[in-house]
Swiss-Prot record:
It comes from Vaccinia virus (strain Ankara). The keyword Chaperone does not apply. Kelch repeats lie at residues 25-76, 77-129. This is Kelch repeat protein B10. Belongs to the poxviruses Kelch family.
């Protein structure tokens, strides 16, 4: 009987992460981590695991620590929106209005747009090349034409 516990644990026990899959790879991004001093830290990395190739999660640094952010993927690229961020690991948490992109093939990050409102808790989805950013704290939905970013940053068929 399957116990429901994955056999390859992630490197850090953290909560409030955002996760997405691209092909056979799982990305677990940001979140909160409680260190040995019992302090809560916003995580500035993501962990990556190819379920068919990797035996251990690899760690990828993010440009800023993030938690409660939205994430989605298209054409092999990861897109992030909103959430709380901190530029220094022990700095102040701030609402974030960035929409950014990560290319796993090149390990490069790009800022592609900004939401009108700074959003502390968000979800992100893409439908027909339009990104929808859902604000869970203020109840707004913002939409952005994602096609320019998709054309510029990915190896999409467009």
């Amino acid at each position: 009987m399957d116990s429901g516990i994955y056999e390859t644990p992630i490197n850090y026990k953290k909560s409030n992460v955002s996760a997405v899959s691209v092909n056979n790879t799982i990305f677990v991004t940001g979140g909160l981590f409680i260190n040995n001093s019992n302090s809560t830290i916003v995580v500035n990395n993501m962990e990556k695991l190819d379920i068919y190739k990797d035996k251990q999660w690899s760690i990828i640094e993010m440009p800023m620590a993030r938690v409660y952010h939205g994430i989605d993927s298209t054409f092999g690229m990861l897109y992030f929106a909103g959430g709380l961020s901190v530029t220094e690991q022990y700095g102040n948490l701030e609402k974030n209005n960035e929409i950014s992109c990560y290319n796993p093939r090149t390990n490069k990050w790009f800022d592609i747009s900004y939401t009108i409102y700074k959003i502390s808790i968000s979800s992100l989805c893409k439908l027909n090349n339009v990104f929808y950013v859902f604000s869970k704290d203020i109840g707004y939905v913002e939409k952005y034409d994602g096609l320019p970013a998709i054309k510029a940053l990915s190896t999409s068929p467009y």
